[in-house]
């Protein structure tokens, strides 16, 4: 389906929060009016897109989200479904165990680039190569966001971070890791897609990809991977 078709067919509606998001996520002190995410962060948008798809597919009661160390770990405050918090990079192993132990579960691994493409790279590729029944949502903001914006494996050439203040130099730090392209070299994955949150149309396309990935899970077809290019202010 083309971008034009997506934009044409998408009906804008004023909606309440999806049932797959918790009604309240209370915080304390000076943070009482805010979420855990910085202003301009893409995580909130992604949460709502995933939750809407869970509702529309009728899979909330079957869903289990794996949220490892990083900004991703806060997902358990917001999603109204099962959740496991894991050590940095270990989400694919935990997701594999959950998927194999509970065959009817819809297993989602929600990971950032500093987690999935760095300390968790080996486990990510091995789970994809085995074709494990899981859906991976890879939130790529090209930096280590939680710890202050250091260079990550996905940081682009010339992109400035606190640890490469003149921009990433491939002669010193190598080239960015492109996860979709890496996973596409494997035979087992069923669905691989890269989307972004750059504008309203791109957000609609992101939801379309998320729903496709979860549909594959619902139908028990195997491994799906959605990379979401997300801002980190």
Describe each region flagged by the PLM:
Residues 118-135, 139, 143-233:
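Glycine-rich ThDP/TPP pyrophosphate-binding loop and its adjacent helix/strand module
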Residues 38-39, 82-83, 111-113, 168, ...:
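A generic structural signal for short
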Residues 3-17, 33-35, 108-115, 168-183:
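Contiguous hydrophobic segments
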Residues 2-145, 208-212:
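Thiamine diphosphate
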């Amino acid at each position: 389906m083309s971008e034009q078709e997506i934009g044409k067919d998408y009906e804008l509606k004023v909606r309440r929060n999806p049932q797959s998001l918790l009604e309240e996520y209370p915080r304390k002190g000076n943070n009482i009016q805010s979420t855990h995410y910085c202003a301009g962060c893409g995580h909130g948008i992604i949460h709502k897109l995933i939750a809407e798809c869970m509702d529309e597919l009728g899979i909330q009661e079957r869903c289990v989200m794996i949220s490892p160390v990083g900004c991703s770990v806060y997902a358990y405050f917001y999603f109204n479904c099962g959740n496991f918090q894991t050590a940095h990079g270990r989400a694919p192993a935990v997701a594999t165990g959950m998927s194999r132990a509970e065959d009817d579960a819809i297993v989602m691994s929600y990971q950032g680039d500093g987690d999935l493409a760095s300390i968790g790279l080996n486990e990510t590729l091995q789970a994809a190569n085995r074709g494990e029944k899981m859906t991976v949502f890879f939130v790529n903001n090209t930096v280590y966001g939680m710890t202050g914006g250091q260079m990550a494996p996905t940081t682009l050439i010339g992109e400035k971070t606190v640890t490469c203040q003149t921009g990433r130099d491939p002669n010193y730090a190598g080239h960015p890791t492109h996860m979709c392209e890496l996973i596409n070299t494997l035979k087992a994955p069923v669905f691989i897609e890269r989307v972004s949150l750059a504008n309203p149309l791109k957000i609609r396309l992101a939801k379309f990809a998320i729903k496709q990935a979860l549909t594959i899970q619902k139908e028990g077809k195997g491994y799906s991977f959605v990379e979401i290019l997300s801002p980190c202010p």
